[in-house]
Amino acid sequence: MKTMINKFRLYYLAILGGLVLITSCNKDLEQLAPIPTPVYPTGNGVAATLAANANYSFYSALITRAGMTTTLNDLTKSFTLFATDNNGMRIFVSAASGGAIPPTGAPDATYLGFINTNLPAASAAGIVQYNTVGQKFPAASIGNSFPNYPITTQIILDPTQPFVRMNIFPVRGTFSYVNNVPLIGTDMAAANGIIHTGFSVAAPPSATLKTMLAGETSLSYFRAAVARADSGQVGLSRFDSLMNYGVTNMTILAPNDAAFQTLIFGMVYAQVLAATGNTTIATTQANAAVALGPSFFSTPAFYGTLPASSVRGIVAYHLLASLTTSTTSPYQPNIRVFSNNVPSAPTLVKTLVNGSIAAHPGVMAQATYTGPAVTSLKFSSYGSFPPGGAPFSYTANAVTTDKLAVNGVYHILDKVLLPQ
């Protein structure tokens, strides 16, 4: 009986406690200040602002073709748009038509006809979405540090994760750019945003680095070197997997086939000459190694000349990197360096080699400019070929620049850079 009484006592105490709470909750609710109704701007939105300017009639047509007019005129939202004027659109139409339409001189109706009819609506949408940012970025707010200031566009990379989006890369300086396109005008005001004007269209990429590199006929040795460097690696430790990972942000310096042929000939020649002292034998063997083509890297007889670890070091030296806060992988390939991001003065840039040797100075990069245009781009390596040269005396020229992929950019070089 005593036990039952104790149980009921606890039961009643619980009920009474609840009643106290209920009684307390019956007090008048605190009156909070009403949430103010947002005050939205009035006037022309981004699309309407361009439509009202005759010098942007072609880009206005592009917005219409893209089905983005309503979005860009929504005064409850804010935008930054990297657009281009009619001159820039003429350049774009000429390129998009494969040169069938000249960059100047054709009637306006010809350019508008291509935009309104020949350009796929999906392509137009991709261009406008890629150049649209969902907040205001006045020119003064765009970063000026190396290499650029990545900001999020309207292109969603993963439909299951709507916040994982493609970036675009403006930078502010003596000359300002979006990606590698010079900005010729900034801060055109619209009621709901800001419009910056590029020299032409900054086109969105559509393939990963792996896919684009696979299509380069002059990079067969580089692809073979990557395969050799990936021996024994798994996951994103494989360069091949990293180059196919859509949400990375990389810069690759890819030596062309002639560059690798020169390196292979020289290394085999030096090795055989040191062993035999016979220049004829050394030349014959070096020519035979070059004759193997890219399969040189998968031929066991030459594994001693270029072990997989050495090839991995060489490939890593051609991927630019920066220092992060990660304690496991402090140096990561997370910067997208366009040619116009490279200073005119020689500048050291870290690479993935720094992941193993933090004190390594990296590669030395230098660009030459005529106005906003990059007229030459070169990279010098710490090591030289033949060995024995002063650090950074061995220089490769970029023969192709600014090949833009979803997950990075690459430049094709005429020499293989050596980390030591």
Predicted regions and their residues:
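C-terminal motif of bacterial Sec signal peptides marking the signal peptidase cleavage site
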Residues: V20-S24
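Sec-dependent signal peptide recognition
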Residues: R9-I15
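Mature, structured domains of secreted/extracytosolic soluble proteins
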Residues: K2-F8, C25-Q420
